[in-house]
UniProtKB/Swiss-Prot annotation:
The modification Pyrrolidone carboxylic acid is found at Q1. Belongs to the AKH/HRTH/RPCH family. This hormone, released from cells in the corpora cardiaca, causes release of diglycerides from the fat body and stimulation of muscles to use these diglycerides as an energy source during energy-demanding processes. This is Adipokinetic prohormone type 2. GO terms for biological process: flight behavior; neuropeptide signaling pathway.
Amino acid sequence: QLNFSTGWGRRYADPNADPMAFLTKLIQIEARKLSGCSN
């Protein structure tokens, strides 16, 4: 979970990052929120 957080931060800050990877991370975060396990 911590590794995923740092990877997400890097992608979020890099405008040249892979958009599909960005969307995948975003979807994973939303899924965690919906399941009540955001943190």
